């Protein structure tokens, strides 16, 4: 089944929690050959090291988290830090939903900062995630289909006024020494036709 969560790049991270009082805490680390977000490389096609943590309440469905990665836009900034919070749950009929807010921050170049609110709904292996940009930030609509429990998935997105993208991903079903591995192929068609991209990404990740 598709479970909506904060998405910044193809991390393909499995879920593993440890209990801390009434909250669940998850730490994650990942190494990738590229950081691709909505079909566009955020590192100039160079490798990315990322990590973060989530604190969530299994009883109430609320969560809050921080995630960061290196970036390269050919400017002063080289770091992205994201802060997010939301509420996620699943109905008795198996319909899951996720509502939240995310702030994308670039400490060395604050003019790049932006914010979104998002709503995701999924049933079995099909889902849609709608992100509403704040203060003139473009909106984004993303459809995802997981092919059963095979680990194979397809995502199609429309980033309003920026471009459209497709991602085909495969998450290997077995971990090795607690490390997960995933691969993906992405295609981005820019709205003006001048910034099209094709990408391949592989990611090693681990949760604690």
Write out the residue ranges for each language-model feature.
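Outer-membrane beta-barrel proteins
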Residues: 2-7, 17-208
